[in-house]
A protein has these predicted regions:
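Catalytic cysteine-centered active loop of the rhodanese-like fold, especially the PTP/DSP P-loop
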Residues: 62-118
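Conserved NTP phosphate-binding and transfer environment spanning the P-loop NTPase/kinase superfamily
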Residues: 229-235, 239-343
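Conserved nucleotide-sensing/catalytic segment adjacent to the nucleotide-binding pocket
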Residues: 158-229
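Hydrophobic/aromatic beta-strand patches that form the interior of the parallel beta-sheet core
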Residues: 18, 35-37, 115, 139, ...
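Flexible, polar/low-complexity N-terminal or interdomain linker segments that lie immediately upstream
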Residues: 1-32, 60, 129-133, 138-142, ...
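Long, charge-dense
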Residues: 113-129, 250, 261-264
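Positively charged, proline/Ser/Thr-rich regional signature most characteristic
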Residues: 11-83
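Glycine-rich phosphate-binding P-loop
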Residues: 97-98, 139-158
Length: 343
């Protein structure tokens, strides 16, 4: 039985989801957890589009049927892997001919419940972008590079706090060194989808802890409304001594070797200055990572000060700490956020 379902109802349905768009469309952005069973390859889709614009819809449809016919059994085999129970949701770009044709094929071959996402992926994207326009209950962890903000975020999660790791979702640590040890980044569109997935189940009555970030994290951008809300939210700025931060950076990066690290220094050499970049490079090549980290932190501290100036100053609360221990600092943040301590 084929029916239509709104995207917000799909989320609570528990149904497996099949995305029949082309591989390229899926790669640019998809609903997290969806299975891609493309009705057409990227090349086939391009050919059909050309026929549609240059000849007629009828010719385009004929070519689509020609491409699809040899793959009918493959569609079924893949759909059975994705939804072995015979219940499934299906979508294409706008909930049009591709998803309807695929759903009909499943219905004719034993699938029991088939839900078509109304409006398709386009409707989902509208919901994603609209979500970040809503007021969000955020608590921001601020601090200079090397303060251990990401580790503190993980500790907060283990203590039962609501957290979202923006850098983890972006697959980037947010600096010239940020790609080191990370996999490939998603597209900005997919990053937004993954963020929405992380946010949509949070309890809005409790704060969500985020790490303070620039508008861009590596090659992806935060949704502008989210980033603007972050600038206006409570920001707990942990002032950790520079030497402790340098030691943390050495612990996190020295293992990748001098070649990778000097490449990262080269990327910021203009901003670091010729003298500092040359000196830092030589120190790294000589294995003096701590001394190099102190030089690099001089640049990043100034850069962070400029970024911090974009925040609503009345919402930035500075906390001086004499430890880089994530357990201690996470517990301290909880006490401040819940009003058990005052600055």
């Amino acid at each position: 039985m084929i029916q239509g379902i709104h995207i917000h109802d799909f989320f609570s349905s528990g149904l497996p989801l099949i995305d029949v768009r082309s591989p390229g469309e899926f790669l640019r952005g998809h609903i997290p957890g969806a299975f891609n069973i493309p009705l057409f390859s990227d090349e086939e889709r391009a050919q059909i589009g050309t026929l549609y614009t240059q000849l007629s819809a009828e010719k385009a449809m004929e070519k689509g049927l020609e491409f699809a016919e040899p793959k009918r059994q493959w569609y079924l085999d893949e759909a059975c892997k994705a939804a072995p129970g015979g219940n499934v949701a299906v979508h294409c770009w706008r909930g049009g001919l591709r998803s309807r044709s695929f759903a009909r094929h499943l219905g004719e071959n034993g699938f029991k419940r088939i839900e078509l996402i109304k409006g398709g992926y386009k409707a989902y994207r509208r919901q994603v972008l609209a979500y970040f326009e809503n007021p969000l209950n955020l608590a921001i962890i601020g601090g200079y590079t090397g303060s251990g903000k990401t580790e503190i975020l993980g500790t907060l999660a283990s203590l039962g706090e609501q957290t979202i790791d923006l850098e983890g979702i972006a697959c980037h640590k947010g600096s010239s060194f940020g790609a080191i040890g990370c996999g490939p980044q998603p597209t900005t569109e997919q990053f937004e989808n993954n963020l929405f997935e992380a946010f949509r189940n949070v309890d809005s009555n409790r704060p969500v802890w985020l790490e303070d970030e620039s508008h861009n994290i590596g090659g992806v951008n935060l949704p502008l409304p989210l980033w603007q809300q972050m600038q206006k939210s409570r920001t707990w700025f942990l002032r950790v001594p520079r030497e402790m931060r340098a030691m943390r950076l050495v612990s996190g990066y020295a293992g990748f070797g001098p070649g990778v690290l000097t490449e990262a220094i080269t990327r910021i050499s203009r901003r670091l200055g010729l003298e500092n970049s040359t000196k830092a490079t030589r120190l790294v090549e000589g294995g003096l990572y701590f001394e190099a980290a102190l030089i690099i932190l001089g640049y990043y501290d100034k850069s962070y000060d400029r970024a911090l100036s974009l925040h609503s100053r009345s919402n930035v609360i500075e906390i001086g700490v004499d430890s880089a221990d994530q357990e201690i600092n996470a517990s301290l943040l909880i006490e401040y956020e819940k009003g058990r301590r005052t600055c």
